[in-house]
Design a protein with these regions (language model features):
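Switch II of P-loop NTPase G domains
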Residues: 64-119, 125-136, 144
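Conserved G1/Walker A P-loop phosphate-binding module
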Residues: 1-68, 72-73, 79-88
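Conserved GTPase G-domain substructure that encodes guanine base recognition and part of the catalytic core
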Residues: 3-8, 13, 20-37, 115, ...
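Charged/polar, solvent-exposed surface patches and flexible loops
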Residues: 52, 110, 145, 149
């Protein structure tokens, strides 16, 4: 069991799975003496996603998003020069779960309450306009409308 838990929420395609993949890609090789390790099953999945993420262009370069009705759990151990610092679990709630409103909100609220940190992801496409008012509307519409009820 992990020492601590982090919860990630955001709409579909906001980049939660890409974030986990990129974090693991950077930290599994080591960075300033720090390394990140995980179990074999998770490592195999993340290594496959890393190869996908390293594709040069196009939509195919992104890892497959978490299934619309799934919550994916990743458990990691952070070490410094082979000495364990902390183990942590990262919960990746599929963006589609936030649209369903069935039992999801209570599950996500419970996860947030048990977490040390909450990561909120907003799709970069929401910022891809020169019109400031449009950007604000894009960010407020889907993410805020879906996330605000769970955060209250």
């Amino acid at each position: 069991m992990a020492d601590t838990k982090y919860t990630m929420i955001g709409m579909t395609s906001a980049g939660k799975t890409c974030y986990i993949t990129a974090m693991y890609m950077k930290m599994s090789a080591g960075f300033d003496g720090f390394t990140l390790v995980t179990d074999d099953r998770t490592r195999t999945k993340l290594e496959r996603d890393i190869l996908t993420l390293r594709e040069p262009k196009g939509q195919d370069r992104f890892p497959t998003a978490t299934d619309e009705t799934t919550t994916r759990s990743y458990e990691f151990r952070l070490s410094y020069e082979t000495k364990k610092i902390i183990t942590f679990e990262m919960l990746d709630y599929a963006g589609g779960l936030l649209r369903s409103r069935e039992n999801t909100y209570e599950q996500v609220k419970e996860s947030i309450a048990e977490s040390t940190a909450l990561y909120i992801f907003v799709d970069g496409k929401s910022f891809c306009t020169d019109d400031r008012e449009q950007r604000e509307e894009n960010v407020c519409y889907d993410p805020a409308m879906r996330l605000t009820p769970i955060l209250q």
